[in-house]
């Protein structure tokens, strides 16, 4: 097998390929142009998006040429893959804003001085519908499309015609990239298999060229929690939506059983180093978790931000010298105290919990601390005297910490 593909297989990235043997032969012969697509449904990518772009980085390191395709055009329709209901249709202005934001994030992760970031609105926005149906639509079998899992799942509950067109447009993207950039490989999540195979078939029918599709496994956590979700919601790559500190802590606190797998998926560390680092158990595995958190934070936010997050975590949880300024904080208005404020109300106000009932449950279970002192009273109140030097430290369980500042 080609070295680049061996690396992907070793690190757990390979799920399905349209023709792995032929792709391996091609990659031995030439620098292959490949692409990963992402729709502009949000102002930020989340960590679920990182997997295909980590693959992109690995392939680029082996000399192959990446294209990141931001779906300024396809976002106007919405991909039904993996969805139980139709996506919300975004305004043109929102899509343009999202495309710009996602482009900026990708530039931090991938070196596009030897690659491309493109927007499929460049060719989709001006399509003539009749010509598209005659030229492209004729190549698709409705019966075959309905056989793909994406449409099987949705057809029972209702699939709009606009969503049904999505597969044609994604296939057309691959067709256009093959024509203008000689792109021969599309990479995506395994839920994209039907769309990717359809693009491979379209190019074969229209151009007589063999191209390839490769899908990646859905990443799950050993504790059953959905990858990319936390108590605070989606783990975004935008520091304004999900702080660098919280991003670091998310990976620092992954279950022990996931450490080795995540080191392979989310870092560029060598095999020997990963195997050695993850061979220990118990508290000794904390070093590997810290390395995982630092490496992925460095990739997404840069080395300076990763160092600050690491320093803040040590200051918060180990009592070591570190920069507490990088620990998340909540600014409490003085007039909110009005003499005093219930701890339960402060927890809801600062959004460390979503409800008063959750706050009561945590206090009753002994999981709430003020300045390292456990609080067991649901009616506990704070006043200005609690805020030594203008702040307190609110800790929830072992892993969540917040500075509350006046």
Curated annotation (Swiss-Prot):
Residues annotated as binding ATP: 229
CDD domains to which the protein is assigned, alphabetical: S4 (cd00165), TyrRS_core (cd00805)
UniProt keywords, alphabetically: Aminoacyl-tRNA synthetase, ATP-binding, Cytoplasm, Ligase, Nucleotide-binding, Protein biosynthesis, RNA-binding
Binding annotation for L-tyrosine: 35, 166, 170
Keyword Chloroplast: no
InterPro entries recorded: aa-tRNA-synth_Ic, Rossmann-like_a/b/a_fold, S4_RNA-bd, S4_RNA-bd_sf, SYY-like_C, Tyr-tRNA-ligase, Tyr-tRNA-ligase_bac-type, Tyr-tRNA-ligase_bac_1
Keyword Aminoacyl-tRNA synthetase included in the entry's annotation: yes
UniProt xrefs under SUPFAM superfamilies: Alpha-L RNA-binding motif, Nucleotidylyl transferase
Assembly: Homodimer.
Biological role: Catalyzes the attachment of tyrosine to tRNA(Tyr) in a two-step reaction: tyrosine is first activated by ATP to form Tyr-AMP and then transferred to the acceptor end of tRNA(Tyr).
HAMAP family tied to this protein: Tyr_tRNA_synth_type1 (MF_02006)
Top-tier EC class: ligase
Chain location of the short sequence motif 'HIGH' region per the record: 40-49
Catalyzed chemical reaction(s): tRNA(Tyr) + L-tyrosine + ATP = L-tyrosyl-tRNA(Tyr) + AMP + diphosphate + H(+)
Residue ranges of every copy of the S4 RNA-binding domain listed in the record: 341-405
Positions occupied by motif 'KMSKS' region: 226-230
Residues in coiled coil: none
Cited Gene3D superfamilies: HUPs, RNA-binding S4 domain, Tyrosyl-Transfer RNA Synthetase
EC number: 6.1.1.1
GO cellular component, one term: cytosol
Protein name per UniProt: Tyrosine--tRNA ligase
Subcellular location: Cytoplasm
Family statement drawn from the similarity comment of this UniProt entry: Belongs to the class-I aminoacyl-tRNA synthetase family. TyrS type 1 subfamily.
């Amino acid at each position: 097998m080609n070295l680049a593909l061996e690396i992907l297989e070793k690190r757990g990235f390979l799920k399905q390929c349209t023709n792995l043997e032929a792709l391996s032969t091609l990659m031995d012969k030439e620098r292959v142009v490949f692409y990963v697509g992402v729709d502009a449904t949000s102002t930020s990518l989340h960590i679920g998006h990182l997997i295909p772009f980590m693959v992109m980085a690995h392939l680029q390191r082996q000399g192959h040429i990446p294209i990141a395709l931001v779906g300024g055009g396809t976002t106007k329709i919405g991909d039904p893959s993996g969805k139980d209901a139709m996506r919300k249709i975004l305004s043109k202005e929102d899509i343009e804003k999202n495309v710009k934001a996602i482009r900026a994030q990708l530039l931090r992760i991938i070196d596009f001085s030897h690659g491309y970031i493109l927007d499929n609105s460049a060719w989709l926005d001006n399509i003539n519908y009749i010509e598209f149906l005659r030229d492209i639509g004729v190549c698709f079998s409705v019966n075959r499309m309905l056989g793909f899992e994406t449409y099987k799942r949705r057809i029972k509950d209702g699939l709009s015609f606009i969503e049904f067109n999505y597969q044609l447009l994604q296939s057309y993207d691959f067709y256009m990239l093959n024509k203008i950039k000689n792109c021969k490989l599309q990479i995506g999540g395994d839920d994209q298999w039907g769309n990717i195979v359809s693009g491979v078939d379209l190019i074969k029918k229209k151009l007589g060229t063999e191209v390839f599709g490769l899908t990646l496994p859905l990443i799950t956590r050993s504790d059953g929690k959905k990858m990319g979700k936390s108590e605070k919601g989606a783990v975004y790559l935008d520091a304004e939506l999900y702080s660098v500190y919280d991003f670091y802590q998310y990976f620092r606190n992954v279950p022990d059983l996931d450490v080795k797998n995540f080191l392979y998926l989310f870092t560029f560390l060598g095999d020997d180093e990963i195997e050695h680092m993850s061979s220990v158990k118990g508290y000794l595995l904390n070093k590997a978790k810290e390395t995982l958190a630092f490496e992925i934070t460095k990739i997404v936010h840069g080395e300076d931000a990763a160092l600050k997050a690491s320093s803040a975590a040590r200051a918060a949880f180990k009592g070591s010298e570190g920069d507490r300024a990088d620990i998340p904080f909540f600014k409490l208005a003085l007039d909110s105290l009005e003499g005093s404020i219930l701890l339960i109300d402060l927890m809801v106000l600062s959004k460390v919990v979503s409800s008063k009932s959750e706050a009561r449950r945590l206090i009753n279970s002994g999981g709430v601390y003020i300045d390292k002192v456990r609080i067991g009273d649901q009616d506990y109140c704070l006043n200005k005297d609690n805020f030594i030097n203008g702040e307190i430290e609110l800790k929830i369980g072992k892993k969540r910490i917040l500075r509350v500042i006046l």
